[in-house]
Every structure is written in C-alpha cells, then in structure tokens.
C-alpha cells in the first residue's frame, strides 16, 4: 500500500492505496472539476532519463487555476545510493487529447555518468518503471512533443512511442542507442500524415523480440528507410508491421531477414494496396511460424508474389484470407507442396482473387484438421478449373458456407460426394452463383440454396 500525506493550506490528508488510486484521489480531493475525466496515468522522461528509484515525500504546492494544467510539485530524494539528492519537480498535466481526457505525469531528472537508478518507490511499495509505466509514451501538449530520448541506453520498451502523433519532429532518432530494447511494437502507429521517416536503418535490433505494428497505418509513406540490414534473428512477433501502409510503393530489400525465431506473421502486408511487387521473400525461414493469415490481404496492386513454394509451414494453424483481394494477381504461386497438416482454417484463402483462372495443384493437401473452409474461393469469378479436391479429408469441417460462392466461370469440379459432412454446422450458399457448373456435378448434400 502507498502511504502518503498531503498538506494543502494546512489541512493534512493521508491516503493509503495503490499508485493509480493515489493519483485518482489527488484529483478527486483537490481537482474536482476534472475528476470525472481521468482515464489513466503515464510517466514521461526527457534527456538522459533512465530508471528512477525515488521516494514520494510531500506535496509542496497545488494550483488549480487552469483546468488544462494543474501543477502538483513533489519533492523527491534519490535512494539509489548513500548520498541523498533532490530531483526536479514532477508536474501533473491535464489535457484533452482527441476527446480522450488524460492525466499525465511528467518527470525530469538529468542523471550523472554511470549512474543507474532502478525504479520508483512510493512509500511502502516498489514498482518497476519498465513493467508498470510506459516510459516513452508520447502525446502532443499544444504544439510540442514532450519527449527527447537522445542518450537513453537502458530503456527496454518503446511500444507505441509515437502513437497517433499529429505533430512529429524527432530527426535525431537515428542516434538512439537501442541495443537494450526488446520491444518496439506500434512505434509509429497511426502516423497517417507522415510522408517521410528519419533514417532508422542503423538501429541495433539484436535484442528486439517484438516489432508488430511498427509502421501500422502510416498511410502516407511512399517509401521506408533502408531496414534491410536490421538484425531480426530474435524477432518473435512480426505481425502487422506494414499494416495499411496504403501509399507504400516499394519496400526495402528485406529478403535476407533472419526469421528463424519468428512465430507470428499475420497481416504483414495487410492492405499495402499500392505495392506492385515484393522483395524476394522466398528464402524466409518461417518454420516456427504459427500464423500467417492475411499476409497479402488487400494487396490490390500486387501483380506477382515471389516463389514461396519452399516455405515450411508445418507449424502454421491459420491460413485464412492469405490472398484476400489480390485483384491484380493473375497467378497464385506454387503452394502445392505445403504441409498444412496443422492448419485449422482455410477461410477466405483465395477470396476475391478475381483475376486468377486456376490455382496450383492442391489436391494432396492434408486437410484433416481444417474446420473452416468457408469463403475459400469466394467471388473468384474468373476461376475456370479446380484441382481434384475429391480426396480432401473433411472429417473435422464445421463450416463450408460460401466456399465456391460466385465462381461463375467454373465449369468443372471433381466428385466430392465422399466428403464427410457429419460435423458441418453451416454450408449454405456453398455453390451459389456457380452458374456454369452443371448441377448434376454437385452432390445433393451440398445443393442447399443453389
């Protein structure tokens, strides 16, 4: 429990509670005008701020003259060594940000060379900044970004650092020492007005395990810094990294990225709708990947996908919407030898691939564990023929709805009368719109709502 005494105009109040409740109580007791709008609390740091080890001693001053900026000056002492040292004040800031009122706490302390402070101590409890606070969270305060991290060398997490920032000016980020950082998810999330990024090609990524959503929805970027030489050997999560970078016309050569440790690869190129080609990703080692769903989802301009025939997907469980909406793609790469024995979902895999006339020979796929075939070839209206899929094992299939919906050019399908339907719960509109497919080719048990 936190034990803190507040002295406001001679009136002393003791609060015992956890750190979040402590700050809420400050506002409820002394800042009543905004108490209903409090959402959360974050710590911000400047310059060479690393990790703090502090004791909250007393509130020295409180001012509520301006509801946009309420100052609570707090006196701190450094308990990391025997020489006590006063810290700069911490200021409590209230500011409406995109109709999401927040309470923010800004702390500032310039540390000496070789000084390392571990965490914050509120009397009675110790909290690790790296676990309990987003040390580098970032919001606009007026026209200023309250963050300057040059020289920081002990931060391990910069998740959502510039999350939806409207005003971005950090040209010196290429200097950052990132060797100790392990997580970089959503760093530039939602910077939709940003047309160019500073050069981050030399960032040390050797200890990073998570770069999911790194450029998420940077929808104005036409190109990226050269990230081809990033050390990605420890990356576990690569999901959403280029999610909805809809103006991106070319990617750096990421063909040599080491993805031996990567498990999560869903949505990598999701709605990169301006990309016409991809780097040669054929040699990516994805044998540890468990999810590659939506990887090329909505790549409307993509005319060709590199040879991915030798990808080892034996651990993948989800292939849903893999090529969804690749409307400019005339040929699906050869995926006939893929081991899909652990795959549970093929939902929408080729959905809206409106230009393909055939698919690779996937007749020998082991589909025993697949429970969802729905929308698999949905709206592939140029598709003329299919491989012999009569031997597919559908014992565990639960959903086949819309599987061949609107395959209006399809003239032949192998006899699938032996497909098991014992566990199927939904199979409506399976062949709806297949106007050129002779009705007698479709077994009665799949004839629903033709």
Question: Whereabouts are the PLM-identified features?
Answer:
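Eukaryotic mixed-charge, acidic/polar low-complexity intrinsically disordered regions
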Residues: 48-73
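Short loop-to-beta-strand transition segments
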Residues: 28-54
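Negatively charged
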Residues: 66-450
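Compositionally biased low-complexity segments enriched in polar/charged residues
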Residues: 5-6, 40
């Amino acid at each position: 429990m936190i034990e803190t005494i507040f002295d406001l105009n001679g009136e002393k109040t003791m609060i015992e509670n956890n750190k979040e409740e402590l700050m809420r109580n400050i506002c409820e007791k002394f800042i009543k005008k905004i108490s209903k709008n409090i959402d959360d609390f974050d710590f911000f740091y400047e310059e060479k701020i690393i990790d703090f080890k502090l004791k909250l001693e007393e509130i020295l001053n409180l001012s509520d003259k301006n509801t946009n900026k309420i100052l609570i000056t707090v006196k701190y002492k450094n308990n990391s060594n025997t020489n006590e040292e006063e810290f700069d004040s911490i200021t409590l800031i209230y500011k409406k940000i995109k109709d999401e009122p927040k309470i923010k706490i800004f702390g500032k302390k310039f540390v000496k060379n070789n000084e390392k402070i571990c965490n914050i101590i509120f009397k009675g409890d110790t909290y690790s900044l790296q676990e309990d606070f987003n040390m580098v969270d970032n919001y606009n305060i007026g026209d200023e970004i309250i963050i300057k991290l040059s020289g920081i060398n002990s931060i391990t997490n910069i998740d959502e650092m510039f999350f939806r920032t409207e005003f971005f000016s950090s040209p010196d980020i290429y200097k950052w020492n990132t060797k100790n950082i392990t997580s970089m998810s959503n760093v530039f999330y939602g910077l939709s007005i940003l047309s160019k990024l500073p050069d981050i090609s030399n960032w040390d990524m050797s200890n990073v395990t998570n770069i999911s959503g790194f450029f998420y929805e940077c929808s104005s970027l036409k190109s990226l810094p050269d990230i081809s030489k990033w050390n990605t050997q420890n990356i576990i999560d690569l999901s959403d990294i280029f999610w909805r970078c809809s103006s991106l016309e070319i990617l750096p050569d990421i063909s040599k990225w080491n993805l031996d440790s990567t498990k999560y690869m869903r949505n990598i190129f999701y709605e990169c709708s301006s990309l016409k080609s991809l780097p040669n990703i054929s040699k990516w080692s994805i044998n540890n990947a468990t999810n590659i769903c939506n990887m090329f989802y909505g790549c409307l301009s993509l005319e060709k996908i590199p040879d991915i025939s030798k990808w080892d997907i034996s651990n993948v469980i989800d292939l849903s919407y893999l090529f969804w909406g690749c409307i400019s793609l005339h040929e699906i790469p050869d995926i006939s030898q893929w081991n899909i024995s652990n795959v549970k979902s093929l939902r929408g895999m080729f959905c809206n691939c409106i230009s393909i006339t055939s698919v690779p020979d996937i007749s020998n796929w082991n589909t025993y564990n697949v429970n969802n075939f729905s929308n698999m070839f949905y709206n592939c209206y140029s598709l003329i023929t299919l491989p012999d899929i009569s031997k597919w094992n559908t014992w565990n299939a639960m959903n086949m709805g819309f599987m061949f919906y609107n395959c209006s050019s399809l003239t032949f399908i192998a006899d699938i009368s032996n497909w098991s339907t014992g566990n199927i719960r939904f199979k409506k509109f399976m062949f709806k719109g297949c106007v050129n497919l002779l009705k007698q080719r479709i077994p009665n048990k799949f004839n629903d709502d033709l």
